[in-house]
Regions:
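Conserved thiamine diphosphate
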Residues: 79-151
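Short acidic, glycine/serine/threonine-rich loops at helix termini
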Residues: 41-47, 67, 94-97, 119-125, ...
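Fold-independent oxyanion-binding glycine-rich loops
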Residues: 21, 34-36, 57-59, 85-88, ...
Length: 202
């Protein structure tokens, strides 16, 4: 509630975004989650008790989320599939959107977009602060242009490249409504969700 109450125009608080996804999930939905930092918040608010309703990998590998969601939906079309992905995780398996678009696999892909590999930045801050002096995190901003970190990647454009409809949301209620519609989806959809949490300059 605190996250929702604090919401204002602009990127969503990660906890508010997680609540919005959980609130919209159809009762029989399968969640494929590969969102390292936002996933922690999502697991706090999910209320699923049906076996096979939550798919997540363990260990250090990245990039399974998009492909796992497409495969899960193609293998069993009796349940809606919602993939919750971090922007960094999505970059490791973005080509999986080709299969979703080509075969019209009705998965709802929710990309939590904070514009960076946040968990790696946090690791560097904790274990190796020497390499981040001056606020430089080389290669860890998912951005472009001379003002790196300010222009987040546009996942709508990426989805559209693969023939997938895409939207960007700026309010929790919008996200809840879109996730709820996954129950009757007949085609893939990507939802680009700008979230807060960008690592500030040090």
């Amino acid at each position: 509630r605190a996250a929702l109450a604090a919401y204002g125009p602009g990127p969503l608080d990660p906890l508010a975004a997680a609540h919005a996804v959980a609130a919209g999930l159809p009762e029989d939905a399968v969640v494929v989650e590969e969102a390292i930092t936002t996933g922690l918040r999502l697991r706090q608010v999910l209320r699923q008790d049906r076996p096979g309703s939550y798919l997540h990998t363990v260990g250090g590998g990245l990039g399974h989320g998009i492909g796992a969601a497409v495969g899960r939906r193609m293998g069993d079309d009796s349940r809606p599939v919602v993939a919750v992905l971090g922007d960094g995780c999505a970059m490791f398996g973005l080509q999986g959107l080709w299969a979703a678009g080509h075969y019209r696999v009705p998965v709802t892909f929710v990309v939590m977009n904070n514009g960076e590999y946040r968990t790696l930045k946090e690791t560097l801050d904790t274990w190796d602060s020497r390499s981040t002096r001056g606020g430089r995190y080389l290669g860890l901003d998912l951005a472009f242009g001379p003002d790196s970190g300010r222009h987040r990647l546009d996942f709508r454009a990426a989805a559209e490249f693969f023939g997938i409809e895409a939207v960007r949301v700026s309010h929790p209620a919008e996200l809840t409504e879109i996730v709820a519609k996954s129950a009757s989806a007949t085609a893939p959809l990507l939802v680009d969700v700008p979230i807060t949490g960008h690592t500030p300059p040090r």
